[in-house]
Regions:
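C-terminal segment of classical bacterial N-terminal signal peptides
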Residues: 1-6
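Structured extracytoplasmic
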Residues: 7-140, 148-154, 159-174, 182-192, ...
């Protein structure tokens, strides 16, 4: 009887090294314009779509390095049971393309969870949980997968926290997965976010499906647009 292969030990200070790489990726992404496409669907208990929301917007960097968002056409909505809130859209910008930069690392406890091959890439796996959540703060609770070669994050999966509940209202958030790909073979940017979850509202369970695509990355001042393969 042969013993199984022992999991490889992670490098020292893995979380801090990943956060350093994340800081570089985030700084690079702030030099790029891109398009964000959102599709949000309500589903019934048979999986049929009962209502949808769709929008496209360009995220643009100005010569003064200020970021603006320009809606392409008008959003289309046939949602019947759910109202998308300002917090939902803020999470699309800040949590679902989650970046664990060095200045964010202190907010989180990280636990090494081994290694895993993701789409042919050997990765270290970290569990990431908030140390505490202050009033009004939005954080990430989930897992990240980082390429063993350069510690670039290739996938995150989890949820924006906390759920927002009061006696009169509730704002619930689905579990999601965000996939990243390399830009110019260097920096790892989000290209696709997907969620398919059932939210336990007081009025009843509601299944939702969310797809966010980040495309047409173009470095400010460059003429070419970077295209990715569809996940």
């Amino acid at each position: 009887m042969a013993a199984g292969a022992r999991a490889q030990d992670p490098p020292a200070n893995l979380a801090r090294r990943i956060a350093h790489q994340e800081s570089q990726n985030q700084a690079a992404r702030e030099e790029y314009n891109y398009r964000q496409t959102v599709e949000f669907a309500e589903l019934n208990d048979r999986g049929g779509i009962t209502g949808e929301y769709r929008e496209e917007r360009d995220v643009i960097l100005s010569p003064q390095h200020e970021r603006t968002e320009h809606m392409i056409g008008k959003p289309l909505s046939t949602l019947k049971h759910i109202v998308l809130t300002d917090q939902d859209f803020a999470d699309m910008r800040g949590i679902q393309p989650f970046v664990m930069t060095e200045d964010q690392l202190w907010n989180y406890e990280t636990t090494f969870r081994g290694d895993e091959n993701i789409d042919g890439v050997d990765c270290w796996v970290l569990q990431v949980r908030p140390r505490q959540i202050l009033e009004g703060q939005r954080l990430f609770d989930g897992m990240i997968w980082a390429d063993k070669r350069d510690l670039s994050v290739v996938r995150v999966a989890g949820r924006a926290v906390p759920q927002i509940l009061s006696t009169k209202s509730e704002n619930l958030f689905p579990r999601f997965t965000t996939v990243r790909q390399k830009v110019d073979g260097r920096h790892s940017f989000p290209v696709y976010t997907f969620a398919d979850d059932t939210l336990p509202f007081r009025s009843g369970l509601q299944r939702v499906r969310v797809t966010i695509r980040y495309s047409q990355y173009k470095r400010f001042g460059a003429e070419s647009v970077i295209q990715f393969e569809k996940p």
